[in-house]
């Protein structure tokens, strides 16, 4: 069996084409995505003046990086001429330089399709996903206990706990070597045991970019490969020592856990009960909208005002109803009063919208979910049958499933896919989808000494997992559900980044050619056009550059005749 590879040559993206991380809730509210933890971001934020040395010359930066482990990096220069310098290989010439570009939506590497709010967010992502880099970034060293003696001259920064265990202090060794130690003596360099010092816990590699989704392609500099590292909580300093209270760090990490299950969040229970009561009160606006959607789901006719794909129209109607109800309820005084009585948790105005969304999914969408999925299965019946037939054909060509060494990881992935389908709220589905991506990357890692792989390996790996999935039809509907129901702000960044990857993997399976034994060598022109159209229609770029195509319905490539 031969699976298609994504195009490795990609255009330098325009500002409109970039997948931008949502900024509405601030940096501390960014979704965790495939990182599964806030540790990399927290470490980078607290050690920013360790790895960011604007006054350092490129020649000196290269000399330092040559002494450090693979994946070590520095950000040098002043805006707008900042560059990322990365040690990509063992030889002295393997120091790569990447221009950091700044846009109204954040920062991005040159030739990359992904934009993040700031440098720490971008580097945190690049510590797990190489994107256009040849390897992932190796983050600064983790916290060490009181009394630990580290004399390694290759250490990027030193973070220590005082004898009371209550304060962290950071000393930037790079700064001391460059500017002198203010009365401190630089220890004599000894031969480091880099293999032992930097035997860091392996991290799940993630892909570079889904370049085959983007607009017309142009050549790009070929940067590949990576290594991964997940750090602990740190602090930041340039030469002086900066102190942080350890308990505050722990609270921040706990509060940034974005992967909590819906059932674990009990603070919205009163709000859910209130909205459920409104849905049962026949005269209320919520009840009228609920009845309209229920009638739409059991009706045999489509939307007379939008003569496009029926399944896409249905999901657009669901999204429109949920958006209208969320806006209506967020302004309702009774809802705001219930929200204000949630308990001892800290209330913030920006938390009201997400709380109403979760409550709406529980009180309105969840009761209608069986009817919604029955309707979607009916509308997609022909396409789902073809997808299942192609899946069976690919299984035959792949051989017995038991031959796979990653069977345990595969069972975990299939269990997550089942939970993904059982979930109702779009945000919960996205969290589970990204968790599946992490599991796929874990299977790609293979071992501590194995070089992590990028998107060229991730797409076939994801496709293979879907070939053996017992839930592939439900997964197809879940992906389409998320592509239509997620807010535009949530579709920027990792959510849109990976949804298009899943779209591509499912497309490869659905269009597998049993006669030739090959998957399609890339997406068809129809699929590419659909994705570009979807991207313009469903992201906030539509507001920045409205086009005639932006208002057209998203025509899936399902209508292609079954060969």
UniProtKB/Swiss-Prot annotation:
Detected in thymus and spleen (at protein level). Detected in lung, liver, kidney, spleen, thymus and skeletal muscle. Keywords: Cell projection, Cytoplasmic vesicle, Endocytosis, GTPase activation, Protein transport, Transport. GO terms for molecular function: GTPase activator activity; guanyl-nucleotide exchange factor activity. Residues 381-518 form the VPS9 domain. It is found in: Cell projection, Ruffle; Cytoplasmic vesicle. GO terms for biological process: endocytosis; protein transport. GO terms for cellular component: actin cytoskeleton; cytoplasmic vesicle; ruffle. Its main location: other. Gene3D superfamilies: VPS9 domain. Residues 184-196, 542-553 have a biased composition (Low complexity). Pfam families: RIN1, VPS9. Residues 181-208, 539-563 are annotated as: Disordered. SUPFAM superfamilies: SH2 domain, VPS9 domain. InterPro entries: SH2_dom_sf, VPS9, Vps9-like, VPS9_dom_sf. Guanine nucleotide exchange factor (GEF) for RAB5A and RAB22A that activates RAB5A and RAB22A by exchanging bound GDP for free GTP. Plays a role in endocytosis via its role in activating Rab family members. Interacts with RAB5A, RAB22A and MUSK. This is Ras and Rab interactor-like protein. It comes from Mus musculus (Mouse).
């Amino acid at each position: 069996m031969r699976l298609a590879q994504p195009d490795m040559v990609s255009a330098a993206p325009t500002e409109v084409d970039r997948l931008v991380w949502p900024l509405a809730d601030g940096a501390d509210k960014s979704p965790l995505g495939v990182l599964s933890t806030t540790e990399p971001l927290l470490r980078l934020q607290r050690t920013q003046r360790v790895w960011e040395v604007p006054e350092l010359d490129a020649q000196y930066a290269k000399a330092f990086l040559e002494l450090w482990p693979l994946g070590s990096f520095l950000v040098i220069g002043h805006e707008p001429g900042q560059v990322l310098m990365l040690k990509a290989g063992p030889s002295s010439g393997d120091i790569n330089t990447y221009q950091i570009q700044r846009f109204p939506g954040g920062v991005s590497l040159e030739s990359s399709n992904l934009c993040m709010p700031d440098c720490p967010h971008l580097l945190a992502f690049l510590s797990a996903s190489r994107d256009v880099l040849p390897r992932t970034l190796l983050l600064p060293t983790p916290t060490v206990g009181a009394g630990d003696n580290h004399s390694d001259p290759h250490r990027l920064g030193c973070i220590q706990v005082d004898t009371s265990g209550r304060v962290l202090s950071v000393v930037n060794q790079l700064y001391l070597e460059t500017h002198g130690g203010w009365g401190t003596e630089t220890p004599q360099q000894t031969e480091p045991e880099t293999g032992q010092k930097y035997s860091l816990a392996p991290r799940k590699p993630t892909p570079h970019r889904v370049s085959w989704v983007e607009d017309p392609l142009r050549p790009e500099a070929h940067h590949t490969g990576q290594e991964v590292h997940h750090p602990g909580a740190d602090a930041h300093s340039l030469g002086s020592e900066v102190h942080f209270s350890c308990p505050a760090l722990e609270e921040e990490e706990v509060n940034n856990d974005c992967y909590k299950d819906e059932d674990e969040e009990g603070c919205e229970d009163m709000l859910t009960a209130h909205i459920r009561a409104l849905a049962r009160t026949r005269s209320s606006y919520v009840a009228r909208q609920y009845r309209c959607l229920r009638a739409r789901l059991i009706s045999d006719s489509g939307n007379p005002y939008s003569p496009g794909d029926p399944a896409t129209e249905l999901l657009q109607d669901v999204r429109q109803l949920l958006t209208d109800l969320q806006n209506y309820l967020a302004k309702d005084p009774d809802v705001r009063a219930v929200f204000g009585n949630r308990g001892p948790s800290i209330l913030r105005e920006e938390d009201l919208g997400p709380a109403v969304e979760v409550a709406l999914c529980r009180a309105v969408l969840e009761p209608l979910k069986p009817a919604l999925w029955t309707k979607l299965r009916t509308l997609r019946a022909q396409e789902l049958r073809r997808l299942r037939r192609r899946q069976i054909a690919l299984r035959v060509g792949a051989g017995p499933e038991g031959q796979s060494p990653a069977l345990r990881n595969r069972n975990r992935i299939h269990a997550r896919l089942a939970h993904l389908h059982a979930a109702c709220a779009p945000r919960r589905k996205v969290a589970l989808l990204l968790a599946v991506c992490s599991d796929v990357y874990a299977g790609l890692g293979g071992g501590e000494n194995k070089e992590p792989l990028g998107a060229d390996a991730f797409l076939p790996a994801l496709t293979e997992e879907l070939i053996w999935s017992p839930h592939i039809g439900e997964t197809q509907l879940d992906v389409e559900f998320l592509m239509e129901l997620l807010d535009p702000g949530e579709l920027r960044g990792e959510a849109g980044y990976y949804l298009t990857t899943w779209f591509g993997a499912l497309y490869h399976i659905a269009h597998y050619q049993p006669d030739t034994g090959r998957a399609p060598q890339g997406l068809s022109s129809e699929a590419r056009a659909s994705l570009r159209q979807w991207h313009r229609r469903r992201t906030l770029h539509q507001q920045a550059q409205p086009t005639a195509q932006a208002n057209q319905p998203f025509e899936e490539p399902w209508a292609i005749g079954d060969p």
